[in-house]
Regions:
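Predominantly the C-terminal beta-signal and adjacent terminal strand-loop region
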Residues: 35, 39, 182, 187-241
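Residues that define the transmembrane beta-barrel architecture of outer-membrane proteins
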Residues: 40-42, 65-71, 115-121, 136, ...
């Protein structure tokens, strides 16, 4: 009798263990499925818009925002979904106009601006929330950006002469661009509408340059001369994989 009771108890324990193990397996599988859901989506896109530019100068130069254009192509690969967050990597190649416009406060109507033309390569993490197929997604982008200055132009208006300007900022007029390679950090947020005909989006970005366009040694005229840009972009993308 005692032996049968022991075997019965062991059987009950084994059944409880198996049931518990199966339950834990289902729970773990369900949690993992909710936490990490693989995706394999490749999209190409185009975008363009407006840049509002200024330069971070030391010593300071009084400025207005200089308008410029931006436009380019993108490649986005979506790899997985964590909870409700869709994770992707995005590579872009863009043309962008940067630079600055000096703010003359002497009431004469004189002006000076300098436009810098760049080919830019942002390497972005793209995180989004919302509908994956049909509907609205909200997203953020962020990462490093590299650029190459391919040309620049200056525009003088009015009767003033560079030698009449304050001594601290006079060297900027006609000064050659020393560093054509630019790098910095870019971040943005936007809304994307996913439709059967493709995806339409609008995005705002801010770029903070970490490199200087002029030499910045102790004997040079400027200790800092870095790009800063606010961008507004409209775009369209389609899935190719």
């Amino acid at each position: 009798m005692q032996g049968r009771r022991d075997r019965k108890n062991r059987g009950n324990i084994i059944r409880k263990y198996l049931l518990t193990s199966i339950l834990l397996l289902f729970i773990t599988t369900g949690v993992n499925a909710q936490i990490e859901q693989p995706r394999r989506v490749l999209e190409i896109g185009i975008a363009g818009g407006l840049n509002l530019n200024k330069m971070d100068f030391q010593p300071t130069i009084r400025q207005k925002l200089l308008n410029g254009a931006n436009g380019g192509v993108s490649l986005r690969y979506t790899s997985e979904k964590y909870f409700s967050m869709i994770c992707a990597a995005q590579l872009e190649v863009n043309f962008a106009q940067r630079g600055w416009e000096e703010d003359f406060d002497d009431g004469t109507g004189n002006s000076y601006s300098r436009t810098l033309n760049y080919i830019e390569i942002p390497l972005l993490a793209h995180l989004s929330w919302g509908k994956e197929e049909r509907g609205v997604q909200f997203f953020i982008n962020g990462g490093p950006q590299f650029g190459f200055c391919i040309g620049d132009s200056e525009e003088y208006k009015g009767s003033w002469k560079p030698e009449e300007r304050p001594t601290s900022i006079r060297p900027v007029y006609g000064k050659e661009i020393y560093n054509t390679f630019d790098y910095g950090i870019v971040g943005g947020l936007g809304v994307e509408l996913k439709t059967k005909a493709g995806n339409f989006f609008i995005e705002g970005r801010y770029y903070y340059g970490l490199s200087d366009i002029f030499n910045n040694s102790k004997t040079d005229d400027f200790g800092r001369s870095a790009n800063q840009t606010i961008s507004v972009r409209l775009g369209y993308s389609i899935r190719i994989l």
